[in-house]
Every structure is written in C-alpha cells, then in structure tokens.
C-alpha cells in the first residue's frame, strides 16, 4: 500500500521534472535551439499540424534556423504561422525555405529569460508540493482506515517528505544551471 503511494509520487514528480526540462527548451539562450518552434502549428489540409511534421527544421549556425517545407506551397503558410507565433524574430522567405535570423541577445533579454527560468522552476516546485499533499492525504486515509499504524504513518510522511526534498533539490539545480547558461555571454 505504502509502496504504491511512493511509486505514484515518484512517477508524478518525474513527470513534473520532465515538463520543466521541456519548458526550459522554449527559453532562448545565446545560441538558437529548434525547440523554440515546438509550439508552432501550421494549417495543413485543414488540420493544425506541428511544424516539424511538414518541414525539415535545422539550426544552420548559432543564430539561424532554416525551415524547408516538404511541399513548396507550404512556404507562405509556414511563414504566417511563425509570424503569428510571436517568437521574437521575423521569418524570411527566400523561395526555397523560411529562414529565422536571431540577433545576439542583450543583457536585459538574458536577465529576463533567467527570471522566466526561475518562475518555471517555482511552478514546478508548486507541482511537487501538490504531489506531496496528495501522497500525505493517501497516507492519512490509510491511517484513518486503520490499514497502517501511527508509527508506519509517521515513517510514510517522512519518506514522502524525503522524496519531495529530493525533487526540490533537483529543480533548484536545473534552475541554477539554466540561469548560468542564460547569463553566460
């Protein structure tokens, strides 16, 4: 019974950690990352399709992303979708592909992105604390139903807290590393 609670807490916490890592890929650092386009969807024969399913997306150098559609008529649609996504650069259609030229980041942009990373980390910590609350509620229910003793419940609360502290430390470490990456010129 308790092992199920611990396993569920660990699985949910792992998902929160992965979500944070995925969120971090959307923050622009000094070099371009094609993941900044992950949320861009284009109209493809009437359905909204992720950009990477209708085109080849490549980082050609540290400041340029090239998007080459598999079907040439998609160029205008891709260009419009990127412009609408508001990622901070204007798409440049050269007739063969859409290019995104990212200017060097200013100190202010880096600091703002570091703040965003910190906010994402705090959001992940809140999720971890909510997972802890759910696990503690499950332990409390077992104790109330007399399925476990008071001593077992105390040990269970300690284990839940230990896992929570472990994940909070991991989040702090991820945020610290991301901030260092963002502020490095």
UniProtKB/Swiss-Prot annotation:
Location in the cell: Cytoplasm
Example of a GO cellular component annotation carried by this entry: cytosol
Gene Ontology molecular function: ribosomal large subunit binding
Predominant localisation class: cytoplasm
Pfam families: RRF
GO biological process: cytoplasmic translational termination
CDD domains: RRF (cd00520)
UniProt keyword annotation of Amino-acid biosynthesis present: no
Key words, A-Z: Cytoplasm, Protein biosynthesis
Organism superkingdom: Bacteria
Matches recorded under InterPro entries: Ribosome_recyc_fac, Ribosome_recyc_fac_dom, RRF_sf
Stretch forming the signal peptide: none
Keyword Oxidoreductase tagged: no
Cysteines joined through disulfide linkages: none
PANTHER family: MITOCHONDRIAL RIBOSOME RECYCLING FACTOR PSEUDO 1, RIBOSOME RECYCLING FACTOR
Similarity remark: Belongs to the RRF family.
NCBIfam families per the UniProt record, alphabetical: frr
Function comment: Responsible for the release of ribosomes from messenger RNA at the termination of protein biosynthesis. May increase the efficiency of translation by recycling ribosomes from one round of translation to another.
Protein name in the entry: Ribosome-recycling factor
Organism field: Campylobacter lari (strain RM2100 / D67 / ATCC BAA-1060)
Classification of source organism: Bacteria, Pseudomonadati, Campylobacterota, Epsilonproteobacteria, Campylobacterales
Gene that encodes the chain: frr
